């Protein structure tokens, strides 16, 4: 199979695995499935973030355009935009965050924590983590959507502000899906490899997949630079990187490695950290 066809197959499998977008019929037959193919598709996680980010940006912009301009409009747009991303992904990453919070919050013992993380029920720590994550995300997005970020020469340009929040959402979803791949590179997989949702990712991620993820992220960051200034991007990416390092250190200390839930939790934390970095740099 030629490289372009292989690239498309890997990307579509990543879309099928990490979103609710249907890949069915002849297309699904063409894409196929194997643990090796899914493992190779890891490099396309940031590419999946493009789809999620575009959906989030479209919903945010549509709500702002339809509703009257009030102080609460950005908040409504942020809530519905976040809800749209949860529907698109099936809450895949949010589920990981809840499981990690329940496991690490429910027991100091490594084995017991891993056992709790396998329980599909949401406990008190998981519920609190989900609530704080969703509140934090929507609050930051509402703030970013309500601040005038237009350059002085443009004045109060509503269209520029729309491009700004759209670029923020797109970049946040892409960067936050690229960084967790470094956990696969740096830490061993400690989940139940036989049944874990991250089974195909249990082996070390290849340098080729990391390169693909870097290319996806670099292209989006370059395009985002048309709406976000360089300083804001650097600060936001730095916040996400610090969040990744903190999560990685936590997993290494408490679990001696990572699970699929850890990857989802890290995506959520890195995304929130990205928006926080943008807010700080305003």
Curated annotation (Swiss-Prot):
Specify the enzyme's EC class, one word: transferase
Cystine links in this protein are none
Keywords annotated in UniProt? Cell inner membrane, Cell membrane, Cobalamin biosynthesis, Magnesium, Membrane, Transferase, Transmembrane, Transmembrane helix
Its annotated pathway reads: Cofactor biosynthesis; adenosylcobalamin biosynthesis; adenosylcobalamin from cob(II)yrinate a,c-diamide: step 7/7
Q: Report whether Metal-binding shows up as a keyword of the record.
A: no
* Catalytic activity of the protein: alpha-ribazole + adenosylcob(III)inamide-GDP = adenosylcob(III)alamin + GMP + H(+); alpha-ribazole 5'-phosphate + adenosylcob(III)inamide-GDP = adenosylcob(III)alamin 5'-phosphate + GMP + H(+)
Q: Which InterPro entries match?
A: CobS
- What is the topology of this protein in the membrane according to its UniProt annotation? Multi-pass membrane protein
Query: A Gene Ontology MF term for this entry?
Result: cobalamin 5'-phosphate synthase activity
Q: Where in the cell is it found?
A: Cell inner membrane
* GO terms for cellular component: plasma membrane
UniProt cofactor(s): Mg(2+)
One annotated GO biological process: cobalamin biosynthetic process
Q: What is its EC number?
A: 2.7.8.26
User: Membrane-spanning residues where?
Assistant: 47-67, 72-92, 124-144, 167-187, 208-228, 231-251
Q: Does the keyword Cell membrane apply?
A: yes
Described by its record, this protein's role is as follows: Joins adenosylcobinamide-GDP and alpha-ribazole to generate adenosylcobalamin (Ado-cobalamin). Also synthesizes adenosylcobalamin 5'-phosphate from adenosylcobinamide-GDP and alpha-ribazole 5'-phosphate.
Sequence similarity:
Belongs to the CobS family.
Name listed for the protein in its UniProt record: Adenosylcobinamide-GDP ribazoletransferase
Q: Whose protein is this, by species? A: Polaromonas sp. (strain JS666 / ATCC BAA-500)
């Amino acid at each position: 199979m030629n490289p372009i066809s292989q690239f498309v197959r890997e990307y579509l499998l990543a879309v099928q695995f990490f979103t609710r977008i249907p890949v069915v019929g002849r297309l699904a037959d063409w894409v196929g499935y194997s643990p090796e193919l899914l493992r190779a598709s890891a490099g396309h996680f940031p590419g999946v973030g493009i789809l999620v980010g575009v959906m989030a940006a479209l919903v945010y912009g549509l709500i702002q355009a339809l509703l009257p301009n009030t102080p609460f409009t950005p908040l409504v747009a942020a809530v519905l935009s976040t809800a749209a991303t949860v529907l698109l992904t099936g809450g895949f990453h949010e589920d990981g965050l809840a499981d990690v919070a329940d496991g690490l919050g429910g027991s100091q013992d490594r084995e017991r924590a891993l056992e709790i993380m396998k329980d599909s029920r949401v406990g008190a720590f998981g519920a609190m983590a989900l609530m704080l994550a969703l509140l934090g995300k929507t609050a930051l997005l509402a703030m970013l959507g309500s601040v005038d970020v237009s350059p002085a020469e443009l004045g109060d340009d509503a269209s520029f502000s729309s491009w700004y929040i759209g670029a923020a959402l797109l970049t946040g979803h892409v960067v936050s899906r690229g960084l967790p791949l470094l956990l696969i590179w740096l830490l061993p997989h400690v989940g139940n490899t036989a049944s874990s949702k991250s089974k195909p990712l249990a082996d070390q991620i290849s340098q080729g997949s990391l390169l693909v993820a870097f290319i996806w992220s670099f292209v989006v960051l370059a395009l985002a630079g048309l709406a976000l200034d360089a300083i804001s991007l650097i600060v936001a990416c730095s916040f996400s990187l610090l969040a990744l390092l903190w999560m990685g250190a936590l997993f290494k200390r408490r679990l001696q490695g990572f699970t699929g839930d850890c990857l989802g939790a890290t995506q959520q934390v890195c995304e929130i950290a990205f928006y926080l970095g943008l807010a700080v740099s305003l």
